Design a protein with these regions (language model features):
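N-terminal presequence-like segments and the immediate start of the first folded domain
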Residues: 1-80, 84-212, 221-331, 337, ...
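Short tight loops/turns at secondary-structure junctions
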Residues: 216, 339-341
Length: 398
């Protein structure tokens, strides 16, 4: 009989850290999923190296709490506070961080890196900790029958593909191409086909049919006035590409993606093998409102980001969608929330909005241990009218 046990360690009003999920599937295979909340390293001086040292230290402690290590990490999100609207400044920060990224992990943990990675410059307002230069979120898995390699988690009878985010950057005739021109629909189509559909097809996976989640970043700092024009172009390209097989997910503006000449960076989650996919049949903001995958008697629910003006209402909507997908609810089955607070030009107003958001958020969870969480300031989420948004991943067995 399949079993799921969710352990929410060190809970506070807005998140637990880390969240540990111990799973036994109906094949009697046991594995654990570990999801620390987003971490910063501001216990050390305010420079890239010191904060990265502190972030690794914090995340490593989270992993050890759950009996796993850095070589078990399969997903890494790097979110940089935007240091400037100037391209060259962002390029330098990116290069400086990348120079210390892997060497410091290796030296501090003694582990190799098996994880994918998706990075972006989020917004000048940054994160709940106002001095943080970046925030990092990781996910890990360990089990006797589980292997992790380059973003692919192989459970033996099914595979969970979580590749790194990709832009239009590619090689041609020995040269690195970073842009294919101003047509965003063509840029999105190129990335989807060349970086995802084609290599998945070579591996025998139907990318369109088997994508269950999609996060889409749209860079806007080179021309902020076109923020929502760009998002709508990319959203339409996404809708046309997937048709009736729409995954759940989200789309939002970021300052810049790592390929500073590119605009679009999508990152999918794709499953293959002995795993079934179910979609809600309801489309909102271009995405299925929820998608489930079921393997070995275990079901995961991925709910698209719900936007609005009140975090409590957004959480209530997520709760109803998890129930609609067959789960007990967000408080019972939720393992991780990604929170997005829309920032404007006034830093004080942005900070006040975060306080309100957290009050609404903690009010909904009052009396229970919340799921893990990462929160970030963004220039928007899903639609221009939304002031905040939350997406969630939940797991249960019937």
């Amino acid at each position: 009989m399949a079993q799921v046990n969710i352990l929410r360690h060190n809970p506070i009003a807005i998140f637990s850290n880390p969240t540990e999920i111990i799973v036994k599937d109906d094949k009697n295979q046991v594995f654990r999923l570990v999801e620390p909340s987003g971490n910063v390293g501001t216990q050390y001086p305010n420079d890239l190296g010191s904060e990265w040292f502190g972030t690794i230290e914090n995340l490593n402690n989270n992993l050890k709490t759950c009996g796993v290590e850095w070589s078990d990490v399969y997903k890494t999100d790097v979110l940089w506070t935007t240091p400037s609207t100037e391209r060259d400044t962002c390029d330098q920060v990116k290069d400086d961080f990348n120079a210390i990224y892997a060497p410091m992990i290796n030296s501090m943990t003694g582990c190799s890196i098996n994880s994918n990675r998706m990075a972006r410059f989020t917004h000048p307002e940054g994160f709940p900790d106002p001095v943080a230069l970046f925030e990092v979120q990781i996910k890990a898995v360990r089990g006797e029958n589980v292997s992790v390699n380059n973003g692919v988690i192989d459970y033996g009878y099914w595979q969970d593909h979580q590749p790194s985010g990709a832009s239009v950057m590619h090689s041609r005739d020995g040269k690195t191409i970073t842009s294919i021109g101003p047509n965003l629909a063509e840029e999105m189509a190129f990335v989807m086909f060349e970086h995802y559909e084609k290599p998945f097809a070579e591996a025998g996976v139907d990318f369109k049919k088997q994508t269950v989640w999609m996060e889409i970043l749209v860079a806007v700092d080179d021309d902020p006035e076109k923020t929502w024009e760009r998002i709508e172009i990319v959203r339409r390209a996404f809708e046309e590409y997937y048709g009736n097989d729409r995954p759940s997910g989200l789309i939002y503006p970021v300052s810049r993606i790592p390929n500073l000449d590119g605009i679009v960076e999508p990152q999918p989650r794709v499953v293959a093998g002995d795993v079934s996919i179910d979609r809600s049949g309801e489309i909102e903001n271009g995405f299925a409102t929820w998608t489930t995958i079921t393997y070995g008697g275990i079901t995961e629910v991925m709910t698209s980001a719900v936007g609005g003006i009140d975090a409590g209402v957004e959480l209530l909507t997520l709760d109803s969608r998890i129930k609609e997908a067959g789960g007990k609810g967000l408080k019972e089955d939720g393992v991780f929330n990604n929170a997005y607070v829309v920032a404007g030009p006034s830093s004080q107003e942005n900070r006040d909005r975060l306080k309100d958001f957290n009050t609404e958020f903690s009010g909904w969870y009052e009396g229970t241990a919340p799921a893990g969480r990462t929160a970030q300031y963004v220039g928007g989420i899903q639609q221009a009218s939304y002031q905040s948004g939350i997406s969630n991943r939940a797991i249960y067995c019937k």
